[in-house]
Design a protein with these regions (language model features):
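Soluble or luminal CAZymes and related metallo-dependent hydrolases
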Residues: 22, 69-72, 134
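Signature of lipid phosphatidyltransferase scaffolds
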Residues: 111-168
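PLD-like (HKD) phosphodiesterase/transphosphatidyltransferase domain
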Residues: 1-54, 143-151
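HKD (HxKxxxxD) catalytic microenvironment of the phospholipase D
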Residues: 89-127
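HKD-type phospholipase D/PLD-like phosphodiesterase module
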Residues: 52-100
Length: 168
């Protein structure tokens, strides 16, 4: 679980696979965030990407597991977006291998590697705070990916949400 999620005020960004464990455990907290107007932006692999099948091999999962989880993520986001909540969940797919887990809640970023033969929830995670070099580099990298229309394309029916900024 994410201890920072309930504290979210304006944004949650992620680079991940299907977030299956997160979706199964944290949907009520996500709904609370969405009612407050918090927007979620998630970058994942294209479900039909050969990299998704490769990740199945790396995590010793059945072929198609990662693709199915990504498809479920998109359906979950579309279902949440169909409700009248102030915040939205936008999912974009990209055609690259995802090398690191990225999780941002407002001014805190968590980064963790995807290791061969190890399930993604079982690796170390590093924490970066706004104002530091790590936070700046990772947040700028996320924005570069998110805005690259040659690399990323929307997977959810909703393709953009009104941006909320942190109050200073």
């Amino acid at each position: 679980s994410d201890p920072e999620l309930v504290k979210a005020k304006y944004r949650v960004d992620a680079i991940a696979f299907g977030l299956g464990s997160f979706r199964s455990k944290q949907t009520p907290k996500v709904e609370t965030c969405l009612r407050k107007g918090v927007n979620f932006r998630i970058i994942t692999m294209m479900p039909d990407s050969p990299y998704a099948a490769e990740r199945d091999k790396e995590e010793n999962k059945n072929n198609g597991t990662t693709s199915y989880s990504i498809q479920q993520l998109v359906e979950w986001a579309d279902k949440l977006n169909s409700r009248s909540m102030r915040g939205k969940v936008i999912v974009k797919g990209y055609s690259c291998m995802t090398l690191d887990f990225y999780w941002r809640v407002d001014d805190v970023i968590y980064i963790g590697p995807y290791w061969y033969g190890v399930e993604s929830q079982q690796t170390i995670t590093y924490k970066y705070l706004a104002g530091g070099k790590g936070f700046t580099q990772y947040s700028e990298y996320f924005e570069t990916l998110w805005n690259n229309t040659d690399l990323c394309r929307p997977l959810t029916q909703l393709t953009e949400a009104t941006s909320r900024r942190r109050k200073r």
